[in-house]
Curated annotation (Swiss-Prot):
Involved in urease metallocenter assembly. Binds nickel. Probably functions as a nickel donor during metallocenter assembly. One of its GO terms (biological process) is protein-containing complex assembly. The gene is ureE. One of its GO terms (molecular function) is nickel cation binding. It comes from the Bacteria. This is Urease accessory protein UreE. Residues 137-170 are annotated as: Disordered.
Length: 170
């Protein structure tokens, strides 16, 4: 088994030995056992930290370089007009603390992608989005504080309320 222990810069001159294709729920973990695209057994032994992104590179303790690929998985893609409609949909979905991927397709249509969820889908339709259910890589936004160190993290707490009248603190 190859022990993948180090994240490396994507500008490395080393050849990629193999690719590890994982869905989002596994790319957030620092410890797991998996099988690469070419059938090699690997174990991830990474410090907690950033999510593994499509194209990230990892080095095995024996020196080989492995590329990470985001697996196709069930997603809902909400297509919506740019500008205020897009901002409004991002705001309302983000207020529900759901992971979101945001992008533009080859035809210039703006989209928001999230794991299938009938409540979120109803909200997106209510706000003017057209939905597509399909298989695609899910690589959500990392969040505003994802690159901050421990000392710089979003450490203060705050409260907010929702339309149904309940509140909670963070």
């Amino acid at each position: 088994m190859f022990e993948l222990t180090k994240r490396i810069d994507s500008n490395t001159q080393d050849a990629v030995f193999d690719t590890l294709t994982l869905p989002y729920e596994l790319r957030i973990r620092g410890r797991l056992k998996a099988v690469t695209d070419n059938g090699h057994d690997v174990g991830l032994f990474l410090d907690r930290g950033p999510v593994l992104r499509n194209g990230d590179l990892l080095r095995a303790s024996s020196g080989e370089v492995f590329s990470i690929s985001a697996a196709d998985e069930p997603v809902t893609t909400a297509y919506i007009e740019n500008g205020l409609p897009l901002a409004r949909l991002c705001y309302h979905l983000g207020n529900r603390h759901v992971s979101l991927a945001i992008g533009v397709d080859a035809d210039g249509r703006h989209w928001i992608r999230f794991p299938p969820d009938h409540v979120l889908e109803e909200l997106a339709i209510l706000l003017g989005a057209q939905l597509t259910h399909h298989q695609a890589p899910f690589d959500p936004e990392s969040g505003a504080y994802a690159h901050a160190g421990r000392e710089q993290s979003h450490a203060h707490s705050h409260e907010h309320s929702h339309a149904d009248g309940h509140t909670h603190a963070h």
